[in-house]
Amino acid sequence: MDINQASLQMHYDLHGKIEVISRKKIETREDLSLAYTPGVAEPCRVIAKDYEQSFKLTRRSNLVAVITDGTAVLGLGDIGPAAGMPVMEGKCALFKEFADVDAFPLCIDSKDTDTIVQTIYLISKSFGGINLEDIAAPRCFEIERRLKEMCDIPVFHDDQHGTAIVVAAALLNAVKVTKKEMGKLKIVINGAGAAGIAIGKHLINMGFGNVIMCDINGIICEGDEGLNPGQEEISHISNLNHEHGKLADALKGADAFIGVSRPNLVTKEMVSIMNNGIVFAMANPTPEIMPDEALAGGAAVVGTGRSDFPNQINNVLVFPGVFKGALSVRAKEITELMKQRASYAIASMIPDEELTPENIIASPLNKKVADVVAKAVADTAIEEGIARV
């Protein structure tokens, strides 16, 4: 039985991967009167007088909403909200397993930006954080921006920022392995959607040299016509030498390639014209170039999104710890500095003496990562003055 059929059978057997468990046993009349009527009226009265008490008297202090509209689910595309539910449930299971953060999946049956924003805002008082998931670009940028302005809890689009954080962590260690200079790198990112643009911004904010964005038409340059707002924004801070051409042109002399695009777009010949290249080919399930081909082309370090190859670059290293840290100090938001510190925290999980071309990033199953990331995020929130406890 292949992995797809095995997963399908597991889902049929389980009828869902998550469930709600009561934290209070209700076995006596007294239990009932404390957990529900009449006793429950008192915490209601306290919250009505002081909104902040909702974080102390209910579970929202440790509860994240995992929300999609089903328009960009994995590599499946626009499959609708109901079909996105297995992914949202899986995400919730990972929150609990790796960070002991409770999470609840919500799938919104709308593609209208205003409707999605209003729906999420109206339910936000039930949660301590909002994890946006699998929402197509460019709509995802506006949805996140507006919700961050409206909500008083962290809003985090994991496809953007989770991916960016873990890629930066892997790149920090790959730079050490290859003895390159972080600030002098030429980095080519193929795929100018939600993940690619977020990776580009994050790497630039961290001081990773010159980032060149590419899409289906080739290199993106400031002043190009037909760019969406996200691409237009990053065009002003990337491709500092105003290069033009196709992906192969961008890769000449490049130190790193980061792919968040489509399978089999890169050849070993293209890798061979890089500068002792770092290759992160993260298209799933088939990467832009297979690791053996990249290595044959002269790549120094290769990472993918897959668990069956070394250096799996996976968001599960990010979102459990980021939210655990933010929730622990009641942070109002997840800032750029918090994201940068998260990248350094993940990178630190591999000591320098253990770094090799096949070992630049912690295993996604390493449950110590979430606590290290959480501490970095929480400490940064306190430092920036956005913690509320």
What is each model feature region?
Residues 1-155, 380, 384, 388:
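N-terminal ligand-binding/catalytic initiation module
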Residues 12, 55-60, 96-97, 122-124, ...:
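Solvent-exposed alpha-helices and their adjacent loops that cap or buttress functional pockets
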Residues 69-71, 79, 108-109, 134-137, ...:
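Short, ordered loop/turn segments at secondary-structure junctions
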Residues 74, 81-99, 157, 161, ...:
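Glycine-rich phosphate/diphosphate-binding loop of Rossmann-like nucleotide-binding domains
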Residues 105, 131-134, 155-158, 189, ...:
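General beta-strand structural signal in soluble alpha/beta enzymes
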Residues 158-159, 281-389:
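Adenosine-phosphate binding glycine-rich loop
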Residues 232-300, 306-308:
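Rossmann-like adenosine-cofactor binding region
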